[in-house]
Amino acid sequence: MCVMNKFGFVAYLICAVLMFSSFDLQKCTDALQKAYEDKDYKAYVNAFPNKYEDFVNVYGYDSKNRQKKVLYDVYVEHLCFLFDDDLVLDDSVLDKLLNLSYNYIWDADAVEYVIMRTKQLLLEHPQRMTEYFSEKTDGEVTSFLQMALTCLIPEDQGYLSKYHKLVETYTPYSNRIVQCLKIALKRAKKASDALVVY
């Protein structure tokens, strides 16, 4: 009979949970690539990473080690596929973008592309985004907006004009979203100030 002490049992449980809940990079990249090649939007969204860290591990670039991530070379095609479909306005896709927004940090390439397209989505579809945000908490709305406002140089006039355009766009729709935009701008600036540029 095998006797396991409490510490051993707890360690076993932690390992088991991590093994079954951890992000499977290979499985994700294979599923994304297949869905993209098949032009299967729903399968692509299903396979799309749920966390910022996982997204970067799939489409990012490790500038410290000068190393491309698995799907770095196809990030433009893949992300165009995600954003160019009318289904990008479905809750399932917007929820994926919301999940990405937690701990979102500015970076070039794929990360910057998502920021740019999210901002465009907000500007072009205020009614739909207002409906979507009505079902979310202030914290969730602020996080989503902060992702769209994340940048390298927050004092840039082009950046500030986009922020003012968002405020102008959402003023007729929702005072709540305008207030969340103000909070998101402060947080995005604070996050940008903390960036270390190599």
Model-derived regions: residue spans:
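Cell wall/extracellular polymer interaction/catalysis modules
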Residues: D86-V88
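Bacterial N-terminal signal peptides that target proteins for export
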Residues: C2-A11
